[in-house]
Amino acid sequence: MSLFKGKTLMITGGTGSFGNVVLNRFLQTDIGEIRIFSRDEKKQDDMRHDFQVRMPEVADKIKFYIGDVRDLQSCKSAMHGVDYIFHAAALKQVPSCEFFPMEAVKTNIIGTDNVLTAAIEEGVEAVICLSTDKAAYPINAMGKSKSLEESVAIAKSRYSGKTKICCTRYGNVMCSRGSVIPLWIDQIKAGNPITVTEPNMTRFIMSLEEAVDLVLYAFEHGENGDLLIMKAPACSIGLQAEAVCEMFGGNKDDIKVIGIRHGEKMYETLLTNEECAKAVDLGDFYRVPADNRGLNYDKYFKDGDVKRNKLTEFNSNNTKLLNKEEIKAKMMELTYIQGRLAED
């Protein structure tokens, strides 16, 4: 963590699952300060108390700022003296955003513009924006708003001066707040059938630790305007549900199919065909550099570029699909799953 030695890191939306994992990983390093910027004072108070109890020797490194990414001034006020930002604040529930799309616009698009405007004005060194696979070929309000969030970030990077701006894009983060596995476990423990939208639906899966790894990789290796993704595996929702049933004593014959919700797709895409054309393979990651052409297109009519990669699209159907035992093994790596199993 030498890059963070003595530095001040700010996490927008920092009381969520991502922020908690960052704190657990960073607090006992040589980082100087971590600022949690969010609008929910109750969650901030709960987080403050939790870390004072669990990690009292380093809890004073955490500073809490109540504010909203929708408010530019509160962003600026919280950023005085900040070196780096992980921008995680977002509305991310697909059905909710379908019913309230303008709220997604205010938080995911305008909020991101505010964060980046404030970061550039305050001389922040680097901002990593967290995005989602739903931003690729978006069909729902949440995905469309996150796609525009990425566009805002890339546009800002062209005029960001010393501030490096990168985006990360990833799929379903297992056991994060609002995700499906905790719901299934609760349903099993209550003696109810577990509800599945569509068994044949596929989704990328990764752990919260891997989500943080991706952000740190982007921070260390990304260039201004880059989009970075991790080569995540995927699984079918039906097989994942069966795995949870077998791990927690549920009856897989009681799985109840309820149908696809508002705005959902049968599979998700991490890299579109167009992005694959210029993607750089970095082993466990792909990097998509920003299109740094200007608005003067005359020269491009004369001097084209026919080079492109063989990869045509990276989605949850053509990545590595995990079998049931592999799904179980991946879930068993999670502290949350270990804790829920220990309840019995």
Segments the model singles out, each with a brief description of its role:
Residues 121, 151-344:
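Strand-loop microenvironment adjacent to phosphate/nucleotide-handling motifs in alpha/beta enzyme folds
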Residues 63-84:
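Conserved Rossmann-fold cofactor-binding substructure of NAD(P)-dependent oxidoreductases
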Residues 40, 50, 133, 233:
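Residues in the short beta-alpha loop(s) of Rossmann-like NAD(P)-binding domains
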Residues 12, 79-88, 129:
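Rossmann-fold scaffold of SDR-type NAD(P)-dependent oxidoreductases
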Residues 38, 65-66, 106, 198, ...:
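Conserved residues in the N-terminal Rossmann fold of short-chain dehydrogenase/reductase
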Residues 7-29:
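N-terminal Rossmann NAD(P)H-binding glycine-rich loop of SDR-like oxidoreductase domains
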Residues 87, 91-150, 155, 165:
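Conserved Rossmann-fold NAD(P)-dependent oxidoreductase catalytic core, especially the SDR/UDP-sugar
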Residues 30-43:
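Conserved glycine-rich Rossmann-like NAD(P)H-binding loop of the short-chain dehydrogenase/reductase
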